[in-house]
Amino acid sequence: SKLIFTREESQTASTPRHEMEIHLRLGANKDGRIRGLDLYTLSNTGAYGEHGPTTVGLSGHKSIPLYSSAEAFRFTYDVVYTNHMSAGAYRGYGATQGLFAVESAVNELAAKLHMDPFKIREMNIVHEGDVMPAYYGAVNTSCTLDRCLAKVHEMINLSLIHISEPTRLALI
């Protein structure tokens, strides 16, 4: 059997993603080397908290390790029950909210330092063989983030060749 909802029914009957308010402080040298990350997440789990603690935890536990070159990091959070529909599990399961905040902060850092955001990421992202402090000193034995980032950079540069510099930087 198959159940097909209209758009309105889907919005009424399904669970929303966890609403999160994220405060992030990013510390870096003038050359763009990230020295510290301080992330606080306030998560609205709705009226019931089946996924509340897990989801909010992933907003920091999946985003901070991407920049493992940082010498200091802190992740704190609160989960609140509200008079809203309970939030459910979706792809990314909390990580997407944290990643959006961290990547937005990296873009803001790049703008402030007048640097290419890809250059800052290349200098700071986790690489294969790196020790990952956020994962209790485990060694990263499998990671192709650097190659993925290089491919994205290539694809974006090819698609933005005919766009003016200020517009191109705003899009990246």
Features from the language model and the residues they span:
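Short, ordered, surface-exposed loop/turn motifs in non-cytosolic proteins
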Residues: 170-172
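Structural alpha/beta core scaffold segments of enzyme domains
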Residues: 1-164, 168
